[in-house]
C-alpha cells in the first residue's frame, strides 16, 4: 500500500494579534499522496493560505504534527526546513514574486544557486525550462518587461528548477486574464501527468475543477473533502542530485548579487562610499603628516648627533642662561680629559651684522672650536676650517654658512675675501655645506663661525661659554659618561650645581614619544570619520533590508539558508566598505603627495595604509552584521507579504 507523501495530524495554527490569540487553523487532518493534483478551496480568511505556508515549510504548526515522507518536520531547524524546500518544493504565487533586479533566466536560476549547482548547468537548465514554457526569446527580460502570464510562467519554471516534486500554487490565476489563467492551469495539469504532486490554493470553483481532488475549507477547518485517488506516479528527481554547495561558489554568487544591488542604487551607494572614502583618506593623510613631522624633527635632531651631550649654565629645571656666567673654557678642557670623549667644543652665540661692499646681512655668530665639524657632524662645503692654532693666535678668520655666502656674494667665490663683522675685519677661509632647517625650524645656514677665542675677545666681550657640546664615543656608555661629567663639573664648581646636562638620545626619545602621541591624536580624529562612515554603512544596509524584504522572502522560499542571506547582506556591506577603502587609499596617497608638493613633510609607510584599509574592511563586517542578521532572521511568510 502506498504511503502518503504529506500527512497532517491535528495541525492548528494560532497567531498572537495585539495580545489576542487567534486560531487560524483548527485541528487539520490531511493526507496527500505522490502524484496527486489537490485543490484546497475556500473563501478569503478560511485559512487556506496559512495551510499552504505550513505545507511548504514556510511556517510551523502551533500544535499537531506534520509528516513529509513519513518523517516529522515540525521540529526541524530553519536550515533543515530550507533544505527541504530547496529539494522537494516549488512555489507559484499569485503575485509571481519575481526579483525585479534579475532577468527571467536569473530568476529561474535562484533555487539552483542554493542547491550548489554550477553556473553552466543551471543556466542550461533555466534556458531549457523557459524554452519549454514558450519564453525562449525572453531570457534576458526583466519582470517589468513581461506580461502577467509570462511572469507566472517564469514563476513556474523557477518552481521546477530543482525538480519540484511538490508544486504549491497559491491562487496562480488570480492576477491573470481568463486566457492566461487557463494556460497556467493546463501547465499544472501537464506537470501532474509528469508525476509532480500539485497542491492548488484557490477560491474559484472553476479553477479547482481542474484538480483530481478538491478539499474545501471554512473558518480554519476542512468542511468537505474528496477521497484521494491513489495512483502510481512517475518519480520526480532533482536534476542536480544531492550535493554540497561550494563556499567559493556561494561567495562568488553573493559578491555578484552585492554588486548588482549596489549598481541598482548607484547614487545611494556613492553617498555611502563617500563616508568610508573620507574616513580612510583622512586616516592616511593625518598619519602621513604626523609621521612626516615626527621624522623631520628627528632628522634635524639626529643631524646634531645622537651621541651628543649639551652642557649649559644655570640651575637644573631653570629657564634662561644667556646672562649666567658659570661655564668657562677650562671646564671644556677638563671634560676633554675624560674617558669616552671624542671631542668637546664651546659655543657662544650672538646676532651680528656682516658687510661686504654694499651688501649687508644680519646673521648669527657662533664662536666655537676647531672640533665643530666633528661634533656637529656638519661637513665643510669648500675651503678649510679654522684650527687650534687659529684659536691660540686669536686669528680673525671666519667660515660662512651657505645663506650668508649667497646674501653677500651671490654667485661669486667668497674664499679669501674680507668681510666686516660688526665693523671688525675677518677673512673668509671656508664655506659650510648646506644644512637646512633646525629642529625648531630656524635656518642653520644663516650663520658665521669664528674661533671662540677671537669671538670672545673681539665680538662678544666675555670668556664665559654659552654652552659646551660633547661628542661621546661609545653610545652604550652615554649614561655613565653623563654622570662622570656631572661629577667633574660639580667638583670644579665647588659643589654647586649651576649647570644643566641634556642628553640628545633622551631628547630624541622624548620627542619621539611626543610626536607619536600627536600622530595617535591625528589618527584618532581621522578614525572618527571612519566610524561615522561605518554608521552610514549600517544605516544604508538597514534601509536596504527594509526595501528588499520581499526579495529576502523569495530567496528563503526558494531554499536559501540563514547563512546564505547573512552572507549576501554582509558581503554587500563589506564590498561597500572595501571599495570605499580602496578609493580612500588612492585619494589619501594623492592628497598626501599634493601636501608634500606644497612643502609639508610627509612620510609614507605601508602600515597606516594597511591599517586604514583593514579598518574599512572590519567596519563593513561590524556595521554590516546587524542588518545582515536582521535579514537572515526574517519570517519568510511576513517577508513575502510585505510590499
UniProtKB/Swiss-Prot annotation:
Compartments where found: Cell inner membrane
Regions that span the bilayer: 270-290, 518-538, 569-589, 606-626
Alphabetically ordered keywords of this record: Antibiotic resistance, ATP-binding, Cell inner membrane, Cell membrane, Membrane, Nucleotide-binding, Translocase, Transmembrane, Transmembrane helix, Transport
E.C. code: 7.6.2.-
GO biological process, one term: response to antibiotic
Entry's family note: Belongs to the ABC transporter superfamily. Macrolide exporter (TC 3.A.1.122) family.
Protein name listed in UniProt: Macrolide export ATP-binding/permease protein MacB
Organism expressing this protein natively: Wolinella succinogenes (strain ATCC 29543 / DSM 1740 / CCUG 13145 / JCM 31913 / LMG 7466 / NCTC 11488 / FDC 602W)
Organism lineage: Bacteria, Pseudomonadati, Campylobacterota, Epsilonproteobacteria, Campylobacterales
Gene from which the chain derives: macB
